[in-house]
UniProtKB/Swiss-Prot annotation:
Protein's job: Could be a nuclease involved in processing of the 5'-end of pre-16S rRNA.
Example of a GO biological process term: rRNA 5'-end processing
InterPro entries per the UniProt record, alphabetical: RNaseH-like_sf, YqgF, YqgF/RNaseH-like_dom, YqgF/RNaseH-like_dom_sf
Compartmental location: Cytoplasm
UniProt-recorded name of the protein: Putative pre-16S rRNA nuclease
SMART domains in alphabetical order: YqgFc
Keywords: Cytoplasm, Hydrolase, Nuclease, Ribosome biogenesis
Organism, as annotated: Pseudomonas syringae pv. tomato (strain ATCC BAA-871 / DC3000)
GO cellular component term of the entry, any: cytosol
């Protein structure tokens, strides 16, 4: 397997999908954007545009497990979304445990100066995507081209 240089991280949701970018050379992930979704279905043209722009070597999709580590209803949907990403775009897709990333993202937003308005109007999904991608980068240094 070729070493990975650039990855996208995705915090999958039914209404919003957070996107982050991470680079092997820095070992860091940062928030990128939030895509709207309808019942978990994104605007696939916008997903295609992100893939065309960033040309990721792989995508990491957050897997929302229950606190005891068992799959949740959303886990199955996130896995299905992962398979669709792979099938549509031919990019390698990994999943990563994302327990508590949204909670942590809300805390990070508060630390940055607080939440302005509702989370629907000012979402934390891209922050959550960066957190889950950072976790994956930290756990898989052997796959990175550094």
């Amino acid at each position: 397997m070729a070493a990975l240089r650039l990855l996208l991280g995705i915090d999958y949701g039914t209404k919003q999908i957070g996107v982050a970018v991470g680079q092997a050379i820095t070992g860091q992930a940062r928030e990128l954007c939030t895509l709207k979704a309808q019942n978990g279905v994104p605007d696939w043209d916008k997903v295609q545009a992100l893939i065309n722009e960033w040309k990721p070597d792989a995508i990491v999709v957050g897997l929302p497990l229950n606190m005891d580590g068992t799959p949740s209803e959303m886990s199955a949907r996130a896995e299905k979304f992962s398979r669709k990403l792979n099938g549509r775009f031919g990019v390698t897709v990994y999943t990563h445990d994302e327990r508590l990333t949204t909670f942590e993202a809300k805390g990070e937003r508060m630390a940055r100066g607080g939440q302005k308005g509702s989370y629907r109007d000012n979402p934390v999904d891209a922050i959550a995507a960066a957190l889950l991608l950072q976790g994956w980068l930290d756990e898989h240094p052997e796959l990175l081209n550094v």
